[in-house]
Amino acid sequence: KCFYIKGDISLDDIKYFRTKGISLVPRVDRNGHINDIFDFSIHKSYLPIDAVLMAGGKGERLRPLTEKTPKPLLKVGSKAIIDYNIESLISYGVKNISVTINYLKEQIEDHFSMPIKGVAVNCVREPMFLGTIGSIKFVDNFNNDTVLVMNSDLFTNINYEDFYAHFKEHNADMSVAAVPYTVSVPYGIFDLEGREIQGLIEKPTYNYYANAGIYLIKRDLLKKIPNDKFYNATDFIELLISENRKVIRFPIAGYWIDIGKHEEFKKAQDLVKHLHF
């Protein structure tokens, strides 16, 4: 039995082909000519998103390692940190990937001078340090209605297909990937009403979700980000909330390390020894 796709492939199509063990699916145009082939032996999925990785920071907390090397190019195991993220996105069928750069930008441009797994990475220079999302205003090659924005110094196995499906299912304007964060208080805590103690909670544990630095955003909303201004993703989240936009969180089920300090860099080095890619 022959399967083929006309136009764009949907998540339902992808799941169907996977359950049937179908690895190759041609896409045909209106004249029946093949213009693409979906290869599920190479890619986990084919997500209709563009991706932008923020790689312009100085990585000051990782000095002296970052004095001559930009943080995204520091190696975890045998690969640069950023390459794990690029290759993961490619495995989900993401073909339009940009990296915004500033500090030691020439090294990153040289690093991506050749395609990775057949995908050309677009390097975009920011003229000044513009925060964790401000430089996206200089990216002008979007093809899809949904844009994934992420920090380039993360070490994670987030499931991008689940992330995107959750975003679409809830018709969100923005989805923020989140990681569980537990705070354990080593003392007894008073339950107070004014000055009076109403009770005692012995060594409580509180569970929260923390911002993981990975976002899915409706492309049209990116125009709200100001030009040539230092602007963080948290500023953008607060703006959308103030406008009563739908901002949701997506819990990451796998591992996640923000490589911002020497301790986290060591954690990633230890973890990668036990992973198989």
Roles of regions detected by a PLM:
Residues 170-180:
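A short, conserved acidic/glycine-rich loop-to-beta-strand motif
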Residues 58, 152-154:
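Active-site metal-binding loops of divalent metal-dependent hydrolases
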Residues 147-148, 155, 161-168, 181-184, ...:
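Catalytic-core segments of class I nucleotidyltransferases/pyrophosphorylases
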Residues 38-68, 81:
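N-terminal nucleotide-binding beta1-loop-alpha1 segment
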Residues 1-3, 66-69:
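Bateman (tandem CBS) regulatory domains
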Residues 3-23, 27-30:
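The conserved cystathionine-beta-synthase
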